[in-house]
């Protein structure tokens, strides 16, 4: 079926390309006309286009003229003219497609065309890049075109506060990374005032390196989490225990490792050893569940997470490495205890665990946009997935000049040692004649191994990996110069062209930056100096370019095949840009991960049969086909996992949409009085039905019902009064009558409550403001608890398959039930708090507004004379509510909030446990975790920013999620403490002197410590 769909998708390519070519011809036909316009006239076209759009013309109608204007502006600002194929690519993006354009074809310049056109609608365009460097670079570089045409350009960076972010999103075109856009969406839906909301909608997005972002990063979600209590000693203890346990196969040893699935299974022997070490009878008792999580994480840290491949240790800190790009992911941590397990393994300080507060997958975030488009050099291999999940077509755009790169067959050696020896020899020969060489490795460890071998041969080279990524743009820009040898961990997403002889544009920008000139800070001086500096560097590299062409162009040498064909193609694609010559080859060994895990035995049998020496390579198309088959298997497996993730996340996505829409309504100051009235009706109805659903009327426990109702509101009716109204006999009561009378009584009490609270000096009823505060606080807390419960449900749902039940159907059914329960809980708690919180109108001293630091959630709430201010939602005029003291209710996870204090009189909540429930969450440093490229196409699991437990595919050995771990800790009391007297036999008396057996005293994790 996928093959048939691929054929159908390709069948329409010719028709689409003919349409795009016709558009390019339209743009060409008016090019001379636009060239005659003055700068002012060209800039004035933007206002004209906007007016025509407002008068009813569509963006499609404006496309040829808008594209012609951008092409002319690019010539005048950058000295670059959009080729016809770039016009075609821009049109493909405007129509909501993915444009596949080979490396060096100018994708960045292409994006300016649809970005400008869609910005004319006035609703904002988001240009999404894979890293902050590219976002800043493109906002400055391509932003020159847009600013010349009168548009505002913004850029989002992690260091920005809310005000700066809001300004950036208000611009016509906003550049940023996928993670920043996604986190801003989540933060906006955690805001306590409209002023904190920074995004203004999701109209149109252009995603650069779209395959990396929408495919590779799609399996793991963006997560904002907050710290929870944990016992660090367990991580250290289990790290030591993991070192003692022995790996085995076929039931031997203490545990087994499946490297393909990246799972670990504990054997019976291993379980017995762990139980003996811990001094417990049954490791899998419910009270010991957290211990199982610690054990699994410790073993995964030992076997599956390798230093200098998956992470590096710098200055006593474990830093994650992006497998595909080789970059260090600063500030990112594995979730669910995995990062702490690695820290314990490495013997560095262990940092706190986190609990999920808000989450969304990139799949669902980008589906929020009304129109989505993307660019990449490698999309056709995933065309089926783009179509099925995102409804995006893939349009392969022709190259401006024919591709003449020579892709040599793979060569395979028996050992890694022999492979690297051959690699160094090949590099030495190419370097000796002056041909530039780009070497791709799959890990920091391998790049440094190769670097050491090159140093011993006396070959000068540059290393581009996670440890030196600050220099990466400069290194890549020079990788095409004569005699250059560049060793790169991976080339995916580098974003800088490798031009033969050197990159004149990069060198020109670098020189202007050294002079202190910037297109943003000093635009006039920058624009004046640019043409001369660019021309100087073009001349400087022209002669060297011709010389390198004669030497054969850039030689790309891959030292290992990746799980994904796209990553291999991205590495190869660095050579042969814009019709330049080039060559590529991959060197492999039977010890490489892909060969070892998939087709290694077959290839080894061939080599042994042919009696191949260790240092003689096997160069065969059959081997190449076997490797391609292995890669296809991995890609299909990962596609199925991503589809499965989407099915599960769709359940939470619908719930998220309901909650976030309601939250926005509250924040924007809608009158909640009618809604609160419905809440009262629903809660009273639920209380009565629960008390009357069984037995006859005379058997109903009305006393218990009245006791429950008194905890909800001040009941004015007595049981005798209600019975008297029914003729004096309880048998005459009906549930409907009780609901009617008690609802009337509750509304009477609420009206009295409103009158008693009175009004603020501006005339607004106090109860209206209180309603907003209460509903917002309760909704946030209940939603966080629901996320935590849904996470726990998803973690164990795969076990339902053993009972012949579809786990997805079960998850949908139970998730819906839990969501309805949460909504009922929001109503009940809101009503209870509205009746019970003690509010007083008191003078409040003027205090400054304190805003949350959006980047890290580390803002500080402002304090007035009456305590810490409750953030004031929009639409709420007048003074602020103030709880005293500002404390977080037990079990309530703090989230960042801005404090909006108004001078003059205000409302103050009397000191009580109820008031604490309405206290604004204390600003705290939050953890932002996000997927990286190895989330899908790489390891076959979502290892980058959140651990496997978040995906529903099930595994043999996985630790608890943040939510479940927190709940298990809460349920098990103090079990998670290091065992005292750990060497004591389990049946012996405990050394503490209690007289109890050790296993029932300090040998029990619940009593340990």
Curated annotation (Swiss-Prot):
Its cofactor is Zn(2+). It catalyses: ATP + H2O + cellular proteinSide 1 = ADP + phosphate + cellular proteinSide 2. SMART domains: SecA_DEAD, SecA_PP_bind. Keywords: ATP-binding, Cell membrane, Cytoplasm, Membrane, Metal-binding, Nucleotide-binding, Protein transport, Translocase, Translocation, Transport, Zinc. GO terms for biological process: intracellular protein transmembrane transport; protein import; protein targeting; protein transport by the Sec complex. It comes from the Bacteria. Part of the Sec protein translocase complex. Interacts with the SecYEG preprotein conducting channel. Has a central role in coupling the hydrolysis of ATP to the transfer of proteins into and across the cell membrane, serving as an ATP-driven molecular motor driving the stepwise translocation of polypeptide chains across the membrane. Belongs to the SecA family. This is Protein translocase subunit SecA. The lineage of its organism: Bacteria, Bacillati, Actinomycetota, Actinomycetes, Acidothermales. The gene is secA.
């Amino acid at each position: 079926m996928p093959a048939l769909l691929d054929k159908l998708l390709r069948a329409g390519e010719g028709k689409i390309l003919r349409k795009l070519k016709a558009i390019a011809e339209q743009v060409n036909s008016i090019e001379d006309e636009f060239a005659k316009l003055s700068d002012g006239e060209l800039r004035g076209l933007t206002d004209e286009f906007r007016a025509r759009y407002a008068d009813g013309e569509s963006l499609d109608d404006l496309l040829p003229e808008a594209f012609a204007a951008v092409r002319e502006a690019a010539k005048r600002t950058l000295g670059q003219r959009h080729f016809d194929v770039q016009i075609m690519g821009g049109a493909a993006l405007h129509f909501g497609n993915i444009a596949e354009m080979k490396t060096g074809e100018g994708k960045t310049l292409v994006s300016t065309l649809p970005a400008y056109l869609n910005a004319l609608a006035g609703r904002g365009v988001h240009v999404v890049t894979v890293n902050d460097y590219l976002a800043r670079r493109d906002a400055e570089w391509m932003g020159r075109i847009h600013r010349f045409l009168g548009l505002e350009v913004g850029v989002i960076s992690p260091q920005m506060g809310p005000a700066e972010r809001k300004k950036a999103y208000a611009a016509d075109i906003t550049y940023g990374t996928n993670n920043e856009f996604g986190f801003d969406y989540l933060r906006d839906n955690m805001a306590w005032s409209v002023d904190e909301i920074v995004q203004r909608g999701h109209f149109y997005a252009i995603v650069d390196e779209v395959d990396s972002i929408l495919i590779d990063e799609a399996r793991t979600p963006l997560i904002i989490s907050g710290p929870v209590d944990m016992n660090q000693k367990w991580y250290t203890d289990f790290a030591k225990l993991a070192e003692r346990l022995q790996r085995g196969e076929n039931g031997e040893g203490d545990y087994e490792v499946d490297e393909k699935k990246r799972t670990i299974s504990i054997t019976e022997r291993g379980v017995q050893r762990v139980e003996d070490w811990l001094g417990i009878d049954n490791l899998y008792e419910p009270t010991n569940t957290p211990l199982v999580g610690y054990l699994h994480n410790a073993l995964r840290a030992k076997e599956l997470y390798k230093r200098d491949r998956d992470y590096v240790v710098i200055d006593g800190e474990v830093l994650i490495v992006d497998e595909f790009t080789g970059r260090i992911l600063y500030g990112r941590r594995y979730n669910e205890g995995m990062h702490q397990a690695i820290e314990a393994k490495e013997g560095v300080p262990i940092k706190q665990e986190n609990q999920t507060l808000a989450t969304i997958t990139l799949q669902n975030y980008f589906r929020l946009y009304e129109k989505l488009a993307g660019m990449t050099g490698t999309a056709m291999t995933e065309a089926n997935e783009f179509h099925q999940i995102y409804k995006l077509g893939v349009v392969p755009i022709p190259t401006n000049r024919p591709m003449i790169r020579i892709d040599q067959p793979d060569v395979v050696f028996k050992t890694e040692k022999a492979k690297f020896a051959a690699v160094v020899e090949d590099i030495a020969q190419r370097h000796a004649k002056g041909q530039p060489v780009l070497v791709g490795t799959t890990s920091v460890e391998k790049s440094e191994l190769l670097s050491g071998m090159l140093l011993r041969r006396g070959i000068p080279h540059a290393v581009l990996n996670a440890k030196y990524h600050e220099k990466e743009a400069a290194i890549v820009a020079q990788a095409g110069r004569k005699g250059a040898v560049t060793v790169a961990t991976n080339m995916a997403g580098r974003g800088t062209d490798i031009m033969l002889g050197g990159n004149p544009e990069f060198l020109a920008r670098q020189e202007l930056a050294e002079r202190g000139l910037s297109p943003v800070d000093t635009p006039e001086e920058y624009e004046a100096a640019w043409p001369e500096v660019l021309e100087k560097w073009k001349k400087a590299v022209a002669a060297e370019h011709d010389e390198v062409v004669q030497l054969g162009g850039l030689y790309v040498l891959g030292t290992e095949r990746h799980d994904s064909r796209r990553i291999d193609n991205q590495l190869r694609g660095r050579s042969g840009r814009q019709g330049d010559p080039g060559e590529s080859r991959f060197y492999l060994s039977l010890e490489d991960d892909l060969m070892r895990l998939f087709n290694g035995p077959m290839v080894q049998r061939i080599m042994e049969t042919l009696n191949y020496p260790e240092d003689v390579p096997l160069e065969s198309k059959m081997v190449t086909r076997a490797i391609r088959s292995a890669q296809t298997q991995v890609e299909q497996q990962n596609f199925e996992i991503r589809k499965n993730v989407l099915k599960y996340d769709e359940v939470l996505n619908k719930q998220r949409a309901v909650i976030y829409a309601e939250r926005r309504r509250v924040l924007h100051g809608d009158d909640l009085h009618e809604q609160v009235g419905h809440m009262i009706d629903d809660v009273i109805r639920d209380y009565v039905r629960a008390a009357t659903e069984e037995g006859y009327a005379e058997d109903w426990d009305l006393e218990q019902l009245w006791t429950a109702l008194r905890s909800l509101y001040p009941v004015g009716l007595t049981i005798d009064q209600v019975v008297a109204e029914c003729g004096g006999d309880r048998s005459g009561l009906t549930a409907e009558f009780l609901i009617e009378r008690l609802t009337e009584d509750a509304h009477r009490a609420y009206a009295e409550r409103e009158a008693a609270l009175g009004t603020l000096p501006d005339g607004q009823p106090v109860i209206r403001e209180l309603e907003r505060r209460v509903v917002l606080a309760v909704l946030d807390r209940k939603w966080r608890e629901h996320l935590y419960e849904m996470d726990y449900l998803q973690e164990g749902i795969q076990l339902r398959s053993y009972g012949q039940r579809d786990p997805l159907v079960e998850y949908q059914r139970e998730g819906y039930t839990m969501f309805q329960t949460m909504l009922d809980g929001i109503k009940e708690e809101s009503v209870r708090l509205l009746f019970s919180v003690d509010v007083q109108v008191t003078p409040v001293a003027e205090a400054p507004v304190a805003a949350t630091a959006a980047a890290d959630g580390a803002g500080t709430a402002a304090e007035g004379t009456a305590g810490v201010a409750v953030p004031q939602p929009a639409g709420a005029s007048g003074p602020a509510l103030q709880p005293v003291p500002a404390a977080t209710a037990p079990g309530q996870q703090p989230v960042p909030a801005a404090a909006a204090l108004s001078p003059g009189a205000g409302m103050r909540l009397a000191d009580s446990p109820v008031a604490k429930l309405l206290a604004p969450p204390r600003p705290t440093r939050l953890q932002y975790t996000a997927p990286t490229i190895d989330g899908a196409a790489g390891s076959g699991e979502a290892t980058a920013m959140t651990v496997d437990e978040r995906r529903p595919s099930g595994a043999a050995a996985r630790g608890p999620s943040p939510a479940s771990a927190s709940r298990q800790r809460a349920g098990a009391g103090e079990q998670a403490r290091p065992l005292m007297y750990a060497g004591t036999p389990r049946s012996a008396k405990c050394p503490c002197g209690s007289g109890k057996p050790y296993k029932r005293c300090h040998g029990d994790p619940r009593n340990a410590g």
